[in-house]
Amino acid sequence: MKKLFFAVALALVSVAGSAQGLKANMDQSVKPGDDFWQYAVGGWLKANPLDKQHAQNGAFTDLEELNKKRINELIMMYADKKDLPQGSDGQKIGALYRLYMDSVGRNKRGYEPILPYLKQVRALKTREEVLKLMYEFDNLGFNTAPFGMGISLNPFKSSEVMMGVGHGGASLAQEYYSEPNESQQKVVEAIKSLNKDYLKMVGYNDAEAERMMQAEWAIEHKIGVKTLNQVAQRNPMLTIHIMTWEQLLKDFKGIDWVTYRDVMGYPTDIDTVNVSQLEPLHVVEDILANTSIDDLKAYMELHVIKAFSGYLSDTFTDRQFEAQKIISGVQEQKPRWKRAVNEISGSLGETVGKLYVKDYFPETSKQRVYRLVKDLQQAFEDRLKENTWMSEETKAKALEKLHAMYINVGYPDKWEDMEKFIDIRENENLIENAIRIGQEVRKATLRKYWRKPIDKTMMGCTPQTVNAFYNPMFNSINFPAAILQPPFFDPESDYASNYGAIGVVIGHEMSHGFDDQGCQFDKDGNLKNWWTAEDKTKYNERTKVLADWFSEQEAVPGLKVNGQKTLGENIGDNGGLKIAYRAYENRMKQEPLKKVEDFTPAQRFYLAYARVWASNATPEYIADCVNSDVHSPHRIRVSAALPMIDTWYDAFGIKKGDKMFVPAEQRAHVW
């Protein structure tokens, strides 16, 4: 049954992404040079309206839904088996599924699972008691301390780990606290309203809940307004402040680091730390010293509720969804089984991932995609060697970095096996299990990585993730199995379409190694300048063209893209398109293709690219993307990216007078 479902699902998606389905996806009443988005995917947009469960649809959503069905089938193999050995993969999956799906039990308990913790907060009398419990609850995963510590990589020697230190407390980006625009303010109000209702759900009257909500928000606002904005956070040098442990104790005396370290179970031999941002951490010191005890208790109570609200009764999850309706525009909550799949795939991601690739991503697929990645790598090398604006010195360093990139396809070469320490107990509730999982994973992480060399071949994501990633400190590109299927990668389509879809994704991730952030890391993943001053100036001039261009793009009426915030992703698309097209040209020399449905291979390349991003979305979702995401909205990743690409003009005969035409001298040429 499982294999049959797979074959049918694959065939259905394949039709949409194949060359034979091109015209069905299109709106040929529109000229490609006037509105390529509508021309390329207008038919698809009309045929695929949003359903109530999604704020955005499209290729990513389709694959995520397909994955949920597949993973659910895997889970069902263990859902009713209660006699499996404790600690076995099947026992963990089945037990966690049953705990999550027990709506009767969860609704009967209400907020009882967190009541003992709330009572502890309510009983606090002194500041010393508040801080002590704040640290202890942080160890349980309640995020009650407005700061934190955790194992991280040394940015200047990325094969070594160190302790990272930073502020907490701010759930939103800095812009939401400083000068929020209209759509950001709606998000703020939705969150504050949700927080107030949470407090009423645990027994407070309206006036008490209002006071406590405002107290918690005041603390969050004090921290959030002093954090770096989203553009500034893209500069690694602004988020790196390495100091000794002794210096941390001296510079931030308002935080009891030794007690916090010991409560959290971190090593006692910490010698250096990296503080991500200094100013907000000083704000935290002031908050801990000068905020009233009642307000600190309000902050803690709300964080106890919020940390695991998704594991409580339907009253909590339904109210949480009401806030999400305002934030994203989604109309209907996903059924419980889909939420269970998300929970299990998140908590037991590698355990599920092993089962997933066994059924849905054979070794032959891994090798086929790996060869495709190597083709793209060769195309990037060709373009770098032909680069006319870089000096030979910098070009040599760029080529070294490209050749040193580690490639992960489908699933990791070596599994991390961090989940073998996880113990799921059905005689405990979801929150008790979640607390123990968090603690066990933290301990296992320390055992595996503290004072030990880092294995940079690790993938850092699960095979069932529908996405792709570049890791600058590993200098690795990662393509999980779940994205390596139609319409991204289709074995039934010709290579022109595949290069325009998954080829651009691959080139995009490679380009991240040379975007405004990635270009600051060397071939070994260390933060180190490898540019001549003149070349870096030229680079900045070229990327500014891209940033300025995207800043002109209006996502929804009255709200434009921030070209500086999205620069890295836009460099990725710009480079990915050019690299993938070069790989397509290289292949054409060996295996020429003919027209299909009157479309040339070059046209099919760009139509496939547009198909990948085809999506309908609510205005709220698009606004949220512009406000809080480093990616441009899907439509703009087509309509603004392609006018920067010379070969797109050639493929469709686009010329001066067409609405999307940009003069050649005004186009961005980076990679």
Task: For each feature predicted by the language model, list its residue ranges.
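Bacterial Sec-dependent N-terminal signal peptides
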Residues: 1-20
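Short N-terminal segments immediately surrounding and downstream of signal-peptide cleavage
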Residues: 20-35
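Short secondary-structure subsegments characteristic of cysteine-rich extracellular domains
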Residues: 53-75, 207-226, 498-504, 602-606
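Short, glycine/acidic-rich hinge or "gate" loops at secondary-structure transitions
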Residues: 54, 83-92, 205-215, 231-238, ...
